[in-house]
Amino acid sequence: SYNPFNKEKEIKRKSIEPSLRYSQHYASSSFSIAIGAENVRYDTNSFALDRTSNWLEAEYKLFFESRSSQSFKSLNPTLKFITLDTDSRHYASIDSRLISLNYNNLFLRNWYSGPDRFLNQDRVILGIEHQKLSLQNDMDLNLLLGKAFFLDNGYYLDGKNKRSSPLVIEFKHRLKGNFFSNGMLEIDSDFNKIYSSHLGLMFEHNKNKRIELRSIYKRLNPYINDMYWLDKELPISQMELLTQWSISDQFMVFGKLLKDNELHKSKDLSFGFQYSNCCMKVGLMKRKW
């Protein structure tokens, strides 16, 4: 009988990716270009995966700014081109799943979480970042929009071959003082459904002191392997509590609590501490699910 937990007992992974990058910054723009090659090899008990990929990336970004004594506004369009020469065969997934898109992930060369699967489509990515600061009423608003367009075949999502990615919208808004709201939407290219979203409230004193409560929704549930789960086709609806708090210059504590809104119980709890200095970083974490 089929057992989804009967995985390969031994997997040997080997990956090498040399690259060369050039960047230039101007008064109101920046340009960068990079070329590289990636070789990945997986050896398992039943098969071997050996893939080589050559790639090129070019990115151009404009900076439009408006300043006054009481406010600051910026609008930064970004255009990125990615082309690849890679093996187009589809191997069984070992380490990878299709990641949910946010603004930063949209500009990545690969949209899979591991190196054994690769998004091999040439594409153009358009993005816009808008920021508005006001010293008069302590307002801070960040808005990001992005979308990718495939030059050849699209990628397979939700049973369809898409020629463009979902539209990604993100925002972060200061409510008052150190309190913020943030959110993200991943909207279908036909604008008729939402693939994923999150909405949260956050207290942030600096990068090392943060508490965030957010709701998470994912219409699709792309697991790492093609396992048969009874709820595989159902969306994910969860609440998540994230904390990280520095107690000194070297020590930080952190934690994460995940609650499933359908099961009405906590399904993932992790906590720990981290020590870091100029030369090293070490931590200890406990996880229960």
Language-model regions: role of each:
Residues 1-274, 278-288:
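Outer-membrane beta-barrel translocator/pore domains, especially the C-terminal barrels
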